[in-house]
Structures are given as C-alpha cells and as structure tokens.
Amino acid sequence: MKAVRYCHVRGCKVYVTLNTLVNDREMRDAVAAAKLASDAGADALIVQDLGMSYAIRCALPDIPLHASTQMSLHNLAGVEAAAEMGITRAVLARELSFEQIRFITKNASIETEVFVHGALCFCHSGQCYMSALIGRRSGNRGLCAQPCRLQYSLGGRMDDHPLSLKDNCLVDQIRRLEASGVHRHSHRRLRQGYPRAAQPR
C-alpha cells in the first residue's frame, strides 16, 4: 500500500502483473492476491489466464483488467473476446506487424498497448514449452530459464546463438504507433548480463 501511494503521489499508475497460468488448486490464492492488490489501490491487474480473469472479474468487478501479451491476443476476434470478458486493455502479441497492430487498434472496442522494447521469444509469446522441457521451468508459469539464449551447435559450431532473437526495439516508431491509435507502449527493463543486441522490426 505504501508503494502504491508513493507512485500515485508522483503521478504514476500501478499495474500489478498476475500474468501466469494457474491451476484449480491455486485459483483461490490467485484471487486473494488480486484482492490484495486492489485493496492496496492498484490501478489495474495484468492477467493471462482466462479462468483467473473470469474469477477476478466475478470477485472484483471494479478493478480494471489488462490482457497480458502472454494471453497471445494476435487478432481482432481475440481482442473482442477478451473485451466480452471484461478486459479493458489488450497488450497485443509482440509478433504482430505494424499493419496488424493498426487494424486491431482501429477496430477494437477496448484500448490497445504494445511493447516497444524488450525480448522477443523464439516461440510465440505465452506458447513456449522449451524451458519446461529442458530445465523443468515453465515459461508459461513465469519461470522461463531462457534456454533459447544459450549457445547451441549449428553445423559443428558452438560459437553462435541460433535461437536467440535480437531484441525488439521500436523506440523510433513510437510516434507512428501513437498516430495509429495505440493507447500505451511498454518496455521491459533488462537484467544485467542479458543480451543487449537490438534492432527495429
């Protein structure tokens, strides 16, 4: 609660991320965490799991819900389905082209948001099993070990990272995105030692 007040006094909004998949045994605790965030004054919750989104909407009808990029909303129909569930903003899938972003934003009944800087997954965001298979840490449960960032042999070479995509960097496209109607743009702070290579899409 103190942290939320600190942010609000300085004109910042607080979005609490609950963007992971939950099972039935965890649902009660997930909704309790959402209530704790709501009671603390969070401005919105960022969610991935459809069942948890429904449970939170039933328990906390007034807290705004934002669909995480992990929800893989990559078309207008998906965004509208999320809107029918009470989602008020869709963080669009990072894999979309500018034209796809513009079309969805122009026709969506809710706000849209896009990432302008951060990692791009080798798989489609929210659909990767690589970390779970290799390191028993599921990227769909918030525990990605980022095995795609490691070196792999390719034609006998071990000095390359064939699965590690260059980071997404749309900083020079922010005005263009705003002109298309996108409501928000996000970036993710990178950990020390994280590959820094980036290029515009």
Q: Where do the language-model regions lie?
A:
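Active-site pocket-lining/capping segments in soluble small-molecule metabolic enzymes
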Residues: 1-73, 91-92, 100-201
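Conserved nucleotide-cofactor-binding alpha/beta core module
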Residues: 75-77
